[in-house]
């Protein structure tokens, strides 16, 4: 990426260790204010000192990228606070410093084999003897740092020597060591701590004694140990074959999101996908990025937060990072807690109200939870590292703080690194993670230190710079980068991704902004020209033309601000309005004169039969006659005569119109009556249909509910009104109609029962049954009790009302007797006729 620090190393996980932890905490280093006045050699020296001072292991990316650092550093305006990879040899042999490794993993130490084929390689934790160096290859030298005292380090990380003799760094994890016969690290003394006990890339809190690796000396190895160590020796070709195994390759992403691959056996890194790589590069997450650093008052430690919510501790003096809680921080937290317990009932010190600032207090629960679970910190702009805001806050429990603690709390500083792709409003907000305890932010004392530009101000200044540089809409980053890279406002944004996102946002919205600015400028120019017309109103009348106006006002800036076509249009609009005003005024004067002239004629009783030649002689002395122009007098006269004729015609027309209106009103009245009759007829038909439908539904209800021919209306009415369909309460059916329908239904039921009973009598009382007599000599035709015994088993007998059964039986018997007598009479008559 042009003009950017392309060697920002990504953060990766320890692929070779089999654990899903960070190889090292994300490094945090002080930000250099500016490098615009540094030479290329000074930039390289500062870069080397940054690597030596951080205490982290070297990090490597493909050489094609890292080799350009020296060239791009001079053009870059923002020195990356993360330690960079040192320039390496392009084609170094296996195990040499030129071998590439992923971030957080140390390349093989710069030890070169001697003439003895069985020479050994220094191991972690062993004393090294003098070793012959290859004079043709210059290994990477770590510059001495005389300003800091030597700190004993663990066997898994050796910082640069504090003396004048350079010392090679140690490996951060077990791997193959260079030499005549590469072999894995084994046989480490048990009194040394295991490298996994501390996070890779960070030095342990305590010192590990008797662990030194002096370059130039071979380790003192006994024959027994050498035999054990040489048991797994293989030649270099075999090691290279192992390094080519596909399972040794892992995928990682840099801070900028660039995907690269690393071989854990050979220590090589490449941007090209290895042949046969079976992983899923698309699922590789972007490594965490440090976003803020909160100094812990009373200590040299700071709590660093990453963009994924994890936190670790960083020492500002020794440049050491650790996931674990440093002992110094624990002790300081315990002291604060003890002081709080001792003075719970005391009143807070008056020192707290001198400047209205609070103090930061660390509670034991917040410290004991460790860096990952500590409270989220308030972040400020990274570009304001010169500001180093100091904030203070009291503990919620009202813990009093002495002046000593106040001075320690004032030393805490908060810085922020804006991660790529992030745009937050975290400034000014406090976020507490669960279980974070009382670890809180501190407020700044603005009287002691100057306030630098905030993140929003830097972004605003960056966009103003783009506007001043004339960045065109929809332009490309690569094309416009040379125009803006050396501007101080470009350097105020520390992150490349934030710069580019601001650039992309600007070029996308710039077109619309230019259109708005152009419209606003054009509108302002038009308003200025109108103001010019107002100022020149005394020189403009209904006869003014463009040439005359330009001759007098053409040198005015407001005149030249718009085009000629618009100038002419606005001037003609103003002149046209003046013309219309003059014409309207003249018309009003002429109308008033005409009204006075016609009033004069009306007073003289001029009729439609008068002649103008005679009338004008009689009006010569009238002032109203003389006030009218000569050519308008006769015109007004004939207008008045036309009005008289129109009035006369109007009277006749009005009379005719009145007659027509009377006739029209009569026709409308008749039409309205006819429509009313039609509407009434339609409504009557609709009412009849609704009543018929209501009667049908009510009859259906009677069929469903009333089945007894002896049912009464008073008893059946409540039953019918409980119908869910409300058929008994239809408004289209009157109560009298309901009762009539009920009685008709009951009557039909009774008639049906009588008909069925008569049919039963006809079936049961046949001639054979009539001849059957009981012991008393009774038959079904002459005895109701006998007939009842015959009819009772049939259901039609039970349906017939009790009081009407015998009556119907007697009528039926009488009919049968009458028919029988008639038949007998006919037979006798027939017989007599024959005889």
Swiss-Prot record:
One function term, GO molecular function aspect: RNA polymerase binding
Q: Which residues lie in Polar residues bias regions?
A: 1-20, 400-428
Tissue distribution of the protein: Expressed in roots, shoots, rosette leaves, cauline leaves, stems and flowers.
Q: Name one Pfam family in it.
A: FF
Cross-referenced InterPro entries, in alphabetical order? FF_domain (IPR002713), FF_domain_sf (IPR036517), TCRG1-like (IPR045148), WW_dom (IPR001202), WW_dom_sf (IPR036020)
- Keyword annotations of the record: mRNA processing, mRNA splicing, Nucleus, Repeat
Q: Where would you find this protein in the cell?
A: Nucleus
Coiled-coil spans are none
Oligomeric state and interaction partners are given as: Interacts (via the WW domains) with the phosphorylated C-terminal domain of NRPB1 (via CTD domain).
This protein's name: Pre-mRNA-processing protein 40C
